[in-house]
Amino acid sequence: MPSSQAQADLWRHTLYYLTSMGLRCAVKLGIPTAIHNLGGVSSLPDLAAALSIPASKQPFLGRLMRALVTSGVFANGKERLLGGLFRLNPLSRILVEGVVAEEHHSQTSFVLAGTSRHYMEAALGMADWFKKDATGPVPTVFEDVHSASLFDESTAALDPELDALVTEGLAAHDNLGIGTIIREFHDLFKGLVSLTDFCCGDGTTSRAITKAHPHVKFTVLDLPKVIDKTPSDGIVNYFAGDLFHTVPKAQAVMLKLVLHHLSYEDCFKILTQCKDAIPSREEGGKVIVIDIVVAPSLGQVMFKEQTLMDILMLVFTRGRQRSENNWHELFTKAGFSDYKIVKKLGARGVIEVYK
């Protein structure tokens, strides 16, 4: 007979999708924002009233909140979970709508995209995908299930709302933590005259860095469909182009959470273009890569989340999360002479790569 711990582990692995759905429910109801508007802490009756939850459903709301507290989405006071106070914690604070703290935009779109029906259907298609042989480029699981690719026009044709959520959620996710990078990596941009921000959407990252480093001339490079929707702000320059063939020349090029979406071959093409766009190391030239660096040495919890993010890449993109050895191989193949990991910030690493 299996141990009670084995059974509990089985429950967790089999049913943990309910935690994701509970998180989605909390975002759809606006629970983080409601608690924020109530001063950051709320009783169950006050929360139910703020959300206009019928009295008949209040006990069920308490059970949902209990599950979300135990999973770390919210915090509680010393009072009992079902009848006490619920508080925002660092996770739920980044799910508050309409509040920007240290350039941390709300992550609600990221949650809603990641728990959407199309994402769930793609994940359910993994077993069938593994059984199918493929000639030529192997399609992603998402492509196999939906006959559409994320980040291009086919997703908009599949579901315009999903396409908007993915675009907004990716931008919010990728800009998360930029305040920390600016504070802790002041020397990263020190002495730079110009920088091309590669595939950075609406330029949020560049504008944030410009406030701390006004001497740097920023150019945001992205696809025409992205740049065309971005209003000129007079702070950074915007350049619409083919990401695989056009990188505006600058002293540095920054790739923030770009390469993990891409195959080895596409990474090679982009890195080669970036290398050609910068001057030598002696002239201050460098490529700044901010991306996940998979490492068991980060500890079991962080390593587990990195491997989870790698499965996300497997299902939805042609990319992967890479170890330092993988990054070294890529940089060498693209013709760079050297690199250094400046620092690791949780799952992410900040890497300088030299021509």
Swiss-Prot record:
S-adenosyl-L-homocysteine binds at residues 222, 242, 256. Pfam families: Dimerisation, Methyltransf_2. O-methyltransferase involved in the biosynthesis of coumarins natural products such as daphnetin derivatives. Catalyzes specifically the methylation of daphnetin (7,8-dihydroxycoumarin) to produce hydrangetin (7-hydroxy-8-methoxycoumarin). Probably involved in acclimation to low temperature conditions. The keyword Protein biosynthesis does not apply. This is Daphnetin O-methyltransferase 1. It comes from Secale cereale. PANTHER family: O-METHYLTRANSFERASE. One of its GO terms (biological process) is coumarin metabolic process. It is an enzyme of class 2 (transferase). It catalyses: 7,8-dihydroxycoumarin + S-adenosyl-L-methionine = 7-hydroxy-8-methoxycoumarin + S-adenosyl-L-homocysteine + H(+). GO terms for molecular function: daphnetin-8-O-methyltransferase activity; O-methyltransferase activity; protein dimerization activity; S-adenosylmethionine-dependent methyltransferase activity. Signal peptide: none annotated. Belongs to the class I-like SAM-binding methyltransferase superfamily. Cation-independent O-methyltransferase family. COMT subfamily. Pathway: Aromatic compound metabolism; Secondary metabolite biosynthesis.
